[in-house]
Amino acid sequence: MNLNRLAIPVNPYEVFKCDVPNMSTALYFVVNDAFYDKALPKSHLPEGVIFGSLKEVARQHPELVKKYYGKLADTSKDGVTAFNTTFAQDGVIFYVPKNVVVEKPIQLVNILRADVNFMVNRRVLII
């Protein structure tokens, strides 16, 4: 795990290219175990929609994350789920309010790349 938050330089645009013809998406990345916010898509999401770092959204909207995070996974019966929940350091959250439509598809690419061995606990919360 990257508990000490070692800086592992990775430019996802250098290691990933989508070759699906005629595909237009809002492209986002998770690099190793963190949401990549250094270069976000220029497309705008509808008002009220939240897409981004689970860690940052938990700071900005704690009531939203608290209401949904870890509610479906039973950590008392599954050790792997409990471990992942306990040690997840970031992830992605996608929140779409009722009656709101996101027109452009969102593409989320997870990239694992490092010069050292470490473990990654990923979290994706879709509401």
Can you annotate each of these PLM segments?
Residues 1-127:
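Glycine-rich and polybasic anion-binding loops at the starts of cofactor/ligand-binding domains
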